[in-house]
Amino acid sequence: MAAPRGRPKKDLTMEDLTAKISQLTVENRELRKALGSTADPRDRPLTATEKEAQLTATVGALSAAAAKKIEARVRTIFSKVVTQKQVDDALKGLSLRIDVCMSDGGTAKPPPGANNRRRRGASTTRAGVDD
């Protein structure tokens, strides 16, 4: 059996608890401010909804890339067959291994410096200019 601790917990008063809550509130505010001011916006924590949205988008992109590759291979097989029996035989022995990556679907993330380009200046009107 474990030995009891040397000193018992002291009962906190209402003032102590209020002071502790205000201290924790200030710390929480400072931490949130520090999180919001990170240099890279991708470093912030994701919410569950954002994670789920990215997961769904990634699965969709990879599925689309895989579907294109599967269709291409099946079309190749079907181009060689003429009769229904040949189709049945070809499909019976069909086994595919597909490798997909995000760059296959065209949905790969842009390079890090892609958003740092300068935008074109806004065009100005010549309404007040006399020719």
UniProtKB/Swiss-Prot annotation:
The record lists the effect of I98A as:
Does not affect DNA-binding; does not affect ability to inhibit host CGAS
Chain positions covered by the region annotation Disordered: 103-131
**What is the recorded phenotype of mutating N28A?**
Decreased homooligomerization, formation of DNA-induced phase separation and ability to inhibit host CGAS
Q: Which residues carry this modification: Phosphoserine?
A: S123
Q: What Pfam families does this protein map onto?
A: Herpes_BLRF2
Record-level Gene Ontology MF annotations? double-stranded DNA binding
Q: Tell me the outcome of changing E27A.
A: Does not affect homooligomerization; does not affect ability to inhibit host CGAS
**InterPro entries attached here?**
Herpes_BLRF2
- Where is it localised? Host cytoplasm; Virion tegument
- Gene Ontology CC annotations of this record: host cell cytoplasm; viral tegument
List where Low complexity composition bias occurs.
122-131
For this UniProt record, the keywords arranged alphabetically read as follows: DNA-binding, Host cytoplasm, Host-virus interaction, Inhibition of host innate immune response by virus, Phosphoprotein, Viral immunoevasion, Virion, Virion tegument
| Entry's transmembrane regions | none
Q: Which GO terms describe its biological process?
A: symbiont-mediated suppression of host innate immune response
- What is stated as this protein's family in its record? Belongs to the herpesviridae BLRF2 family.
- How does this polypeptide assemble, per the annotation? Homooligomer; homooligomerizes and binds double-stranded DNA (dsDNA) cooperatively. Interacts with host CGAS. Interacts with PQBP1.
Its function, per the record, reads:
Plays a role in the inhibition of host innate immune system by targeting the CGAS enzymatic activity which is the principal cytosolic DNA sensor that detects invading viral DNA. Acts by inhibiting CGAS-DNA phase separation: directly binds double-stranded DNA (dsDNA) in a length dependent but sequence independent manner and is able to form DNA-induced phase separation in infected cells. DNA phase separation of ORF52 mediates disruption of liquid-like droplets in which CGAS is activated, thereby preventing CGAS activity.
Name of the protein described by the UniProt record? Tegument protein ORF52
